[in-house]
Structures are given as C-alpha cells and as structure tokens.
C-alpha cells in the first residue's frame, strides 16, 4: 500500500503485491511495474508514505530580495502598511515593542542606526507569514514559517517553509 518511486525501473505508484520473487507496483497511469525484491535493498528508492501520513506535502521555496532595497521603515511607510489587513496588527504590535525598547534603553532616536527599528524586509516577512496562514491550502496544524537565510550573491533569501493541506 505504500507509494514508492524508483525512476530507474519505471516505478512510480502504489505497491500492490509483495512476494518472495517480485514486488508489483501499480503506477499512476495504471501500468504495473515488477521489481525484484533485492533491488529494494541494493538500490535506492523513495517511499512517500510518511508524506501521505503527515497531512500534507512539504513546500520549501526561497524568494531572493535585493540587498540594496532593504531599509528602515519611515512613519509614512508604516502608515501605508497599517492599511494592509494582513499587516495592521503586526505593525501596531511591533511598533509598540520597538518604542518601549528604545524608551527603556534611553536610545537617541535622532540617529537612525541607534536602537531598534522596523525594516521593510521584516514587514515583508511578516506579510508572507500571515498570507500563508490565511490560505486554506496550507495545513495550519503543521509547521508554517518564513525565515531569512544567509545572504548570497543573488540577494537575501526569504525561505517559505510550510505543508500543503492536500496530500
């Protein structure tokens, strides 16, 4: 009953029979592939059963952001972001945390690099996270995150990591 793939032998489907001499796989085009059992031990194959039982397929994609486009958010930018339904609560909550931190640590706000500030990259990451969490096609019971990876020569990768709701 497991779904296996062995491209080398043309198998991509459900195991329907296992005997001492053969393993029969019903491919998704309804053809039958017969494989000697020793190949399952001596060669590599992919068993998709864990993915089927997990409740969804894992999706892992990156979006590269041009490093030169990242900047601190101005009050005008934050006002625009607050108008976006998926961002309003995040911007309000984060701005409160930033202001409290800067006040508590007596930060001189006249210099932008002092203290904490929101960036357009951080706000975009929050937007992507909230967007994924709003989709019915994303499994909300399993991990769903957007994280920033190490910068590369092509930019700053934002990795989207989640599981689909359909197997």
Predicted regions and their residues:
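Membrane-proximal, solvent-exposed terminal domains/tails of membrane-associated proteins
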Residues: 73-83, 88-167
């Amino acid at each position: 009953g497991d779904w296996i793939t062995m491209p080398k032998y043309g198998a991509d489907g459900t195991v329907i029979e296992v005997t001492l001499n053969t393993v029969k796989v019903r491919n998704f085009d309804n053809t039958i592939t017969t494989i000697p059992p020793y190949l399952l031990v001596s060669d590599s194959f992919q068993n998709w059963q864990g993915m089927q039982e997990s409740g969804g397929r894992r999706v892992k994609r990156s979006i590269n952001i041009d490093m030169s486009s990242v900047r601190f958010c101005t009050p005008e930018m934050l006002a625009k972001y607050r108008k976006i339904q998926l961002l309003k609560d995040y911007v309000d909550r984060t701005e409160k945390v930033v202001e409290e931190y800067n006040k508590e640590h007596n930060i001189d706000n006249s210099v932008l690099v002092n203290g904490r500030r929101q960036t357009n990259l951080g706000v975009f990451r929050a937007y992507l996270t909230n967007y994924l969490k709003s989709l019915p096609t994303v499994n909300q019971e399993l991990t769903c995150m957007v994280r920033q990876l190490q910068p590369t020569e092509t930019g700053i990768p934002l990795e989207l990591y989640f599981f689909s709701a359909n197997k």
